[in-house]
């Protein structure tokens, strides 16, 4: 009799635990993913991209794809987006290529896409020292003394920048931006050519703001050995090494 009561108690306890776990599962089913879960999913996507761009052997010329693209304003540097914003898929039909470095949604200009992980690393990793040149319209009239700070490196929130090549340049002949840049009529603007040997998030914008001259328009003109040439916004061409 005692043995049977013990068995019944154990069974009841087990049923209670199962019921508890079912209730928790039902409760959590309608909840949005936690920050930790979102981070895990993001890391998986990042690792998948890195794997796709890290072939175990060098690609042959026939296998390698290299695309030069003039990214328009208000376009994401990726092929998918769940919010209906413009992406690379709106312009480029070629599959299995990935952007070597990114451009912010509100930046324009040269984006290089490739399926070659070795080339992607050569263009983006700091130790490779591939130069990236930007044409930057800033608010105000910086003097040489202002630009010297960028040439020697400035300290941003994520640390000091490497010395940059910075020159005042004539206003380039460009396509109109849509929507147009919003100017303040009483304040002049200046165009700068800025060449970096590194690439951090919104680095050029933060650098010009650091010396007191906010960026109004930013166009990447060249990256490594390639430049925009005569590509218009939304146009692309395939090149060979």
From Swiss-Prot:
Pfam families: PseudoU_synth_2. It is an enzyme of class 5 (isomerase). Its EC number is 5.4.99.20. One of its GO terms (biological process) is pseudouridine synthesis. Residues 1-65 are annotated as: Disordered. Keywords: Isomerase, rRNA processing. InterPro entries: PsdUridine_s_RsuA/RluB/E/F_cat, PsdUridine_synth_cat_dom_sf, PsdUridine_synth_RsuA/RluA, PsdUridine_synth_RsuA/RluB/E/F, PsdUridine_synth_RsuA/RluB_CS, RsuA_PseudoU_synthase, TruA/RsuA/RluB/E/F_N. GO terms for molecular function: 23S rRNA pseudouridine(2457) synthase activity; RNA binding. It catalyses: uridine(2457) in 23S rRNA = pseudouridine(2457) in 23S rRNA. Residues 1-14 have a biased composition (Low complexity). The keyword Iron does not apply. Belongs to the pseudouridine synthase RsuA family. NCBIfam families: PRK11394.1 (NF008487), pseudouridine synthase (TIGR00093). Responsible for synthesis of pseudouridine from uracil-2457 in 23S ribosomal RNA. This is Ribosomal large subunit pseudouridine synthase E.
């Amino acid at each position: 009799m005692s043995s049977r009561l013990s068995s019944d108690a154990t069974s009841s306890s087990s049923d209670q635990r199962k019921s508890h776990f079912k209730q928790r599962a039902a409760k959590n089913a309608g909840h949005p993913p936690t920050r930790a879960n979102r981070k895990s999913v993001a890391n998986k996507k990042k690792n998948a991209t890195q794997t796709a761009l890290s072939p175990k052997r060098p690609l042959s010329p026939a296998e390698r794809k290299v695309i030069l693209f003039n990214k328009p304003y208000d376009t994401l540097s990726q092929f998918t987006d769940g919010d209906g914003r413009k992406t690379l898929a709106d312009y480029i039909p070629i599959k299995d290529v990935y952007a070597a470095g990114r451009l912010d949604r509100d930046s324009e200009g040269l984006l290089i896409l490739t399926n070659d992980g070795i080339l992607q690393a050569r263009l983006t990793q700091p130790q490779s020292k591939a130069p990236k040149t930007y044409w930057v319209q800033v608010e105000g009239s910086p003097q040489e003394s202002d630009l010297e700070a960028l040439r020697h490196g400035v300290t941003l929130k994520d640390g000091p920048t490497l010395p940059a090549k910075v020159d005042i340049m004539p206003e380039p002949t460009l396509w109109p931006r849509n929507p147009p840049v919003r100017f303040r009529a009483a304040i002049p603007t200046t165009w700068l050519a800025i060449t970096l040997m590194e690439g951090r998030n919104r680095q050029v914008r933060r650098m010009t703001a650091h010396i007191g001259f906010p960026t109004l328009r930013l166009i990447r003109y060249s990256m490594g050995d390639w430049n925009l040439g005569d590509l218009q916004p939304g146009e692309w061409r395939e090149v060979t090494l």
